[in-house]
Amino acid sequence: RIVRINGDGSIRLILDDVAKDSSGNSIKTAFNTNKDDNAYVGYMYGTPGSTTYDTTHENKNDSTIKIAVDRWYEDNLKTNYANYLSDTLFCGDKTLAESGIGSNNTSTGYGVNITYYSSIERLIYSTGTTDITTSTPTLKCAEKVNDNYSRYTTTKSTLPDGKETNGNLKYPIGLLTADEVAYAGAYKYNQTNKSFYIYNNNITIFWWTLAPISFSGANALILRVNNSSADLYYNYVNTSYAFRPTVNLKYNVKFTGTGISADPYKIVTE
């Protein structure tokens, strides 16, 4: 399903269903098997137990979910569709929220220090733990910082705003940000909207986004989508949920079809 047109002209697509194995069973995975360090909010992460933000969040290790997403790509897209995919960035925003967000926020992002990440101040809290009235999602990625830990691509590159991507992905595949899900119409916890654009009534289980939300002092948390109520909320990274793989089609890909359900777009392979 088409999510949006990216800034480089490529077309972002999300799988209409959750990822499934060869037997047709939904693939469920933890975001990270471990949850007891700030490092584990990352789609990729550095060294748990570190005493600096940089060593915690540099992209040295694959998350549990990244391994599952990459395996799905190898099984379903690598052989026949790799040439049609664009290396457009995926954003796992590990930048820190302002110090006034959350409760006892240290704004450090390492070890077991209580830390809140930027997605929470755009989508969940306005100040402290006060629920936000109007969400402010963004399609820009980690624009406040110069480090590239949040901007995932397969090849390191410089964006139009001068920020760099990290080139740490193995394949040009990822997940949606919580901001993209919010733009599609999903609401925050307990605010149901089953008419949101990427809602699928056949999905009955939760699915992960790329968005770090916080480290509570004991647990790393990521935003996920409750498809039953069509809302955004967070849970521990070691919880097993489904995922919906997301890719970007090159701007010049040829296709047939009119885009309606009876005549969907189909890539013309050569």
Language-model segments: what does each one mean?
Residues 1-270:
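Long, domain-scale functional regions
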